[in-house]
Every structure is written in structure tokens, then in C-alpha cells.
Amino acid sequence: MFASTWQTRAVGVLIGCLLDVVFGDPKRGHPVALFGRAAAKLEQITYRDGRVAGAVHVGLLVGAVGLLGAALQRLPGRSWPVAATATATWAALGGTSLARTGRQISDLLERDDVEAARRLLPSLCGRDPAQLGGPGLTRAALESVAENTADAQVVPLLWAASSGVPAVLGYRAINTLDSMIGYRSPRYLRFGWAAARLDDWANYVGARATAVLVVICAPVVGGSPRGAVRAWRRDAARHPSPNAGVVEAAFAGALDVRLGGPTRYHHELQIRPTLGDGRSPKVADLRRAVVLSRVVQAGAAVLAVMLVYRRRP
């Protein structure tokens, strides 16, 4: 059906992106949720309070997913490689669900329904919402939309385009494990070390590509490309994450808001440096962040196809 592997991959990536835009994540039976349950079951066997045990745990899961992806990509049939690439890309993306949740939190905060916004926030990030009021919920949601623009939108597309089904499924496995065990809590400080470091590596290039796209797309929401570059260069290194800081700083500068500060998780309170030098984010800024995130995903889809064509034999 298609003349070469690169055409197959390009078409599959675009179809997968379209599936995410149209359908989003299913409420039941999502492959990432199934993987998460399997990882939790395996943890009951592999858990030891040490880095080696954590590395074994991550290696088994990511290796299994990568082998599954390689097998799917090599099944016979002219249409199957496109279907496999499209399905894997769709499973790894989460842009539509991210935007939907961001808009729902915006709606709740505009109605001053803080309790409902608190209940919804954990579906977006791992923050402890119990002590957060409207401004804190707004900042937490905006920071999560920014960070997940890379994790759930741009980076999966780049891995799918550059290396195919095994890579994009392996990336989603790594990112899911980081969200499950990559914390500095007493239980996971050592066991989750490998997941956290591998996630840093897997997102390094993609996070910076995301920041570049934020700079380019900022005018769509009335944002400042110059402000995005300034905050990125000045503030990103202050963030405890080498990747989230890049994207969050770019969003802060583009939207002329100030992010960072006290950040409470269930296991600890982090006092983070500020990113950007604008105003405290308002609900309208959260809405702008959601729109910017979606535009960045569209830009990433174009970039992914360009990457496939550039790598063709």
C-alpha cells in the first residue's frame, strides 16, 4: 500500500494523532491503565528498598513492552504496520484528555467550586489538593498542563516518528513508571531511582523541542515568544526536574505569569524557585495554556512527519 517504511510510519503517526484528537482516552480498558495495573502487580514481587531492584523492575516492564512493540511492527500484511503505528501512537498520546481536564478545572474555578476542582486535580497531577484554594489550584493545573504538553503530546510523537512502535510504547512505559514510582518518598527514593533517571533521559530532547514549539506558537494565544525564551534561559535550571523546568518556564514566559513556589505532594512539601516574572496565574491564563498546549501538539505532529521524511533512506 505504501512505497516505503518511512511513508508507513508518517501515515501511522498522523492517524494516531487524529485518533487522539477525535476520541481521546477511553474511560475503560486504556492500554496505559492496563500496563499500570500490571506494573503494580509486578511490584509486589520485585520490590526491595534498593536501586538494583528498581532497575530490574523497570527493565522487565520496559523490555517486555519494547519486545511487544517490535513484534507488532513486524507482523505480515501491507496495512498492518500503519495500523500498529497508529494504535501505538494513539495509546501513547494524552492531549485530548489533558485539554478536557484543564478546561473542566477552569470551568469549576470560574464557578468558585473549589471542592470539585480539588477532586479533579489528582487526575491531572500528583499534587495534594487538600490545602489548595483557587489560586493554588490554578497554578497547579497550569503547571501540569505545561509539563504534560511534553510528556503526553510532543515527546510520544517524536519517539514514534524517529524509532517506530517499540520506541513509542517503551517511552510510554517509562513515563508511566516514573509517575508511579519516580518519587522521592521513603518507599521509592531508591526503588524509583531508575525510573526517574530513565524518564529524564527519554524526555531530554523532546522537552526542549516542546519549549521551541511554545516559543513559536505563543502568539496564537496572545503570548510573547521573547518572554518564553527569556524565562526558559533564565529560570529553567532552577527547577528540580531537568525537563519539566524547561517547558514550565517557557509557558510562564509565553503567558506572562509566575509559576513555582510552595508545591505540596502527598509525601513532601517542595519549595520551588519561581519561573517567569509575570502575574500570578488566573483562570483565563489556564484556559490560554490549554489552547497553547493543543496548538503545540499540532506543531509537533508536523515536526514528527518532517522528522520521518528526513530519516528516510
From Swiss-Prot:
InterPro entries referenced in this protein's UniProt entry, alphabetically: Cobalamin_biosynth_CobD/CbiB
Regions annotated as coiled coil: none
> Recorded GO terms, molecular function?
ABC-type vitamin B12 transporter activity; threonine-phosphate decarboxylase activity
- GO annotation, cellular component aspect: extracellular region; plasma membrane
Where does the protein principally reside?
membrane
Q: Which UniProt keywords apply?
A: Cell membrane, Cobalamin biosynthesis, Membrane, Transmembrane, Transmembrane helix
Q: Which residues cross the membrane?
A: 52-72, 79-99, 154-174, 204-224, 289-309
Q: Which GO terms describe its biological process?
A: cobalamin biosynthetic process
Q: Where in the cell is it found?
A: Cell membrane
Topology with regard to the membrane? Multi-pass membrane protein
Q: In which pathway does it act?
A: Cofactor biosynthesis; adenosylcobalamin biosynthesis
Q: What does this protein do?
A: Converts cobyric acid to cobinamide by the addition of aminopropanol on the F carboxylic group.
Q: Which PANTHER family match?
A: COBALAMIN BIOSYNTHESIS PROTEIN CBIB (PTHR34308:SF1)
What protein family is recorded?
Belongs to the CobD/CbiB family.
Which HAMAP family does its entry note? CobD_CbiB (MF_00024)
This chain belongs to the protein called Cobalamin biosynthesis protein CobD
